[in-house]
């Protein structure tokens, strides 16, 4: 549920344990 970054397109979400939801990075 916590936003990890601005957009999953520009940031390596998966490498920091985040997932891409609605074009945004989230973690729990």
From Swiss-Prot:
It comes from Leonia triandra. It holds the Pfam family Cyclotide. GO terms for biological process: defense response. Keywords: Disulfide bond, Plant defense. It comes from the Eukaryota. This is a cyclic peptide. The presence of a 'disulfide through disulfide knot' structurally defines this protein as a knottin. Belongs to the cyclotide family. Bracelet subfamily. InterPro entries: Cyclotide, Cyclotide_sf. Probably participates in a plant defense mechanism. This is Cyclotide ltri-A. There is a cross-link at residues 1-28 (Cyclopeptide (Gly-Asn)).
């Amino acid at each position: 549920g916590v936003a990890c970054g601005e957009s999953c397109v520009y940031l390596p979400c998966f490498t920091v344990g985040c997932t891409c939801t609605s074009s945004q990075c989230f973690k729990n």
